[in-house]
Amino acid sequence: MSVARHQRSPELVGMPLEEILEKYVGRFRDKAADWAAFADAKIEGYRRAQHRFIGAGGSGKHDDPTIIPPGNFTLSIVYVEPGQGNAAHTHEVEENFFVLQGFLDVFIEDESGKRLTTRLGPWECICCPAGVIHGYQNDSLAPVYVQIMLGRGKPETMGYADDKLYERRDQHLKAAE
């Protein structure tokens, strides 16, 4: 007989294993590519598709019925075509980019505009600390799949460094209503 050495979360107490397995498994084949996941995603140069697995990530789409309920982090897979990326931004928690396929140029930046960039390949990552301006660009000739994790179950939407994008950072959520 097995012994659980830690208590289940309150919402799982009494839940049969079959229901837990059904609720907490996510499959890529069941995830629709969301090309409007972020406020900047319709702007040329920032087009990308989010596949939400655990929580909504920085998209703010926390009511997505297809996600695994988040606890203390989120996990998404983002598809980035050549020439695309995301706008410089911050989060209130750390954000991790883990490249699964392709090559991705990631950057960190300070308020003076100084930017440092490095290229990540498959099975390489960067952890962007809270409050540090960061982002990525696919400057290669092939698509990229990158796993993105945020260190909070329901993080705020992206804190864009650009004032105009920041003012509209929730606009994509209102358009979906």
How would you label these PLM feature ranges?
Residues 63-69, 86-91, 108, 117-118, ...:
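Short histidine-centered beta-strand/loop micro-motifs
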Residues 82, 93-95, 99-105, 109-110:
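Glycine- and acidic-residue-biased ligand/ion/polar-headgroup-sensing regions
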Residues 2-12, 110, 135-177:
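Double-stranded beta-helix
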Residues 77-78, 88-89, 94-99, 118, ...:
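His/acidic/aromatic-lined binding-pocket segments of jelly-roll/cupin-type domains
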Residues 56-63, 74-91, 130:
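Conserved short histidine dyad/triad with adjacent acidic residue
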Residues 1-72, 164-177:
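A short, N-terminal "cap"/entry segment at the start of jelly-roll beta-barrel domains
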Residues 84-87, 105, 126, 130-135:
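Histidine-centered metal-chelating micro-motifs
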Residues 110-130:
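Short acidic-glycine-tyrosine-enriched beta hairpin
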